[in-house]
Regions:
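Solvent-exposed, non-transmembrane regions of membrane-associated and secreted proteins
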Residues: 4-7, 14-205
């Protein structure tokens, strides 16, 4: 397990009024159960890979993250990022999974922050670092908030500074500690950019 890293948890300006209302608990329950099965399938597949194959996946991801550093404004110019979809594409676009013990959350992480990815779990924002850690990386992960039929990041506002969460990619598990909770506008990228020498993750709703 790697040492605790700093992270930024950003709560966007998505309305959270629905958080206080009752959800169709049965639908949410079964969706959460499906996520557990998906994660179990991913873990089983990952365990079947040789050490050499795992190292190859992670080396490609590290190289991708290094290439991001040379691109000017990759967040506002994602089409300039090449090789994204083919990197860390282990199982049907799933690159790993996120676990937040303090809110009992465990969700698969998929490429792109598209509606399809968010429906299935957590989406990774193209133009940000892949979530495999390392110096000068900043991965941004997003999910739905307040959906009636799935948990997503509905309880993200319950996180507090000092809480920890983990990201598992293949056989590699990274542990992060919450050090900031902010509200940002959708077009504000300053808090999502790479900070030299830091290993950051933003959870965005």
């Amino acid at each position: 397990m790697r040492r605790l890293k700093k992270s930024v948890v950003v709560s966007g300006l998505v309305a959270v009024i629905a958080v206080c209302f009752g959800y169709p608990a049965i639908s949410s329950y079964f969706n959460d159960k499906d996520n557990v099965k998906v994660i179990q399938g991913y873990s089983t597949e990952a365990k079947g890979y040789s050490e050499e194959v795992v190292d190859q996946f992670l080396s490609e991801a590290d190289a991708y993250n290094q290439n991001l550093l040379a691109i000017k404004n990759p967040l506002s110019n994602p089409e300039s990022v090449t090789g994204y979809e083919d990197t860390l594409n282990v199982q049907s676009g799933m690159m790993g999974y996120l676990e937040i013990p303090s809110i009992d959350l465990k969700l698969p992480i998929y490429h792109f922050s598209s509606s399809d990815s968010l429906e299935r779990g957590v989406g990774h924002m193209v133009g940000t670092s892949l979530p495999c850690g390392g110096e000068s990386t900043h991965a941004v992960l997003s999910s739905h908030n307040g959906m009636s039929d799935r948990t997503g990041f509905t309880n993200l506002e319950l996180l507090e500074k000092g809480n920890v969460f983990t990201i598992t990619v293949l056989s590699k598990t990274l542990t992060y500690q919450v050090d900031q909770i902010k509200t940002v506008l959708p077009d504000e990228y300053e808090d999502l950019t790479i900070v030299d020498g830091e290993d950051l993750v933003t959870l965005l709703t």
